Design a protein with these regions (language model features):
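Conserved SAM/SAH cofactor-binding pocket of Class I
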Residues: 104-208
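Mobile active-site "lid"/loop adjacent to the S-adenosyl-L-methionine
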Residues: 200-231
Length: 296
């Protein structure tokens, strides 16, 4: 637990609060000093303020909040749930309890879409399992002429996407639907681009994840069944891929050990009406993004 400083030993300056917080966070897996500075940067509004205000007193109301944040982080609550926002593809997104925190590796999905649609930008985008909305909002910001639909079955992601839609001035271009993936979309409606980052962690592996994930992130957004592939079977087996226009793309994130399922001998390599799947590796060499192009 956090040792609340007594009145006579309470830190005064920003720098002295950083020393205290670093000491309190030494048991974390991440470097304590970096965590302490990151929380302070969010508190003050920028990393530069941590430097320029280092010798200045931290106002009492901010000091109280900093103590609360450090205590929450010491209990392994994720950094971005404490601050309430996360950077993704050049923008800040709101995040909240009950919503999967966007990961840096997911930016590869957005990058691949950007690279492959330069000559023919999508006009309509569908995301299955919208979560925070980081993927579809980033894509809509890349393509000012596009509109999008995001589907999620849980209320917390819908609320979070509403916040980010407003935050990024996308109210008129992003439509949100709550429900099962295909059942929520009007019959016959097709899109130039379908994207998804579905749950892909094998059920037996969930409890072995970091405490921040196991204790604070929604298991429904993580658990992909016995082999982690249940949601891909659901998406591809329900013919929701027919929602992709001729010439359009279907792009999904996969787990680090799932490349085999989408390459030549895998069950998802060839889909009727699509070119064979292409697997793109992340910076660590793991298959991370799968791309299918609809023929026509």
């Amino acid at each position: 637990m956090v040792e609340h400083p007594s009145a006579h030993e309470r830190p005064i300056t920003v720098d002295s609060w950083l020393v205290w917080a670093t000491r309190m966070l030494l048991d974390l897996d991440d470097p304590a000093g970096r965590e302490a500075r990151g929380l302070m940067a969010s508190l003050l509004g920028s990393a530069a303020s941590v430097v320029t205000r280092g010798a200045s007193p931290l106002p009492p109301e901010l000091a109280d909040r900093y103590v609360e944040w450090v205590e929450r982080r010491q209990k392994r609550e994720p950094f971005h749930l404490i601050t309430g926002e996360v950077p993704f593809f050049g923008n800040l997104f709101s995040v909240r309890s009950g919503v999967l925190i966007p990961r840096p590796e997911t930016e590869l999905l957005v990058e691949q879409v950007s690279v492959r649609t330069k000559s023919c930008p999508p006009q309509s985008i569908l995301e299955l399992g919208g979560g925070s909305g980081a993927i579809i909002c980033s894509l809509l910001l890349l393509y000012p002429g596009a509109s999008g639909v995001a589907v999620d079955i849980e209320p917390d992601p819908i609320r979070c996407m509403l916040e980010n839609r407003k935050r990024l001035s996308l109210d008129s271009r992003l439509h949100l639907l709550r429900g099962n993936w295909d059942d929520s979309i009007a019959g016959g409606l097709c899109f130039d681009l379908l994207v998804s980052n579905p749950p892909y962690i094998a059920s037996a592996e969930i409890d072995g994840l970091m405490a921040e994930v196991v204790q604070y992130e929604p298991h429904r957004a993580l658990d992909g069944g016995v082999d982690g592939l249940d949601c891909y079977r659901e998406i591809l087996g329900s013919k929701i891929d027919s929602r992709v226009m001729p010439g359009g793309l279907m792009v999904m994130e996969i787990g680090a050990g799932q490349r085999w399922a989408f390459e030549r001998s895998g069950p998802f390599f060839e889909l009727e009406g699509f070119d064979p799947a292409e697997v793109v590796s992340d910076w660590a060499g793991h298959g991370r993004v799968v791309i299918w192009k609809r023929k026509g």
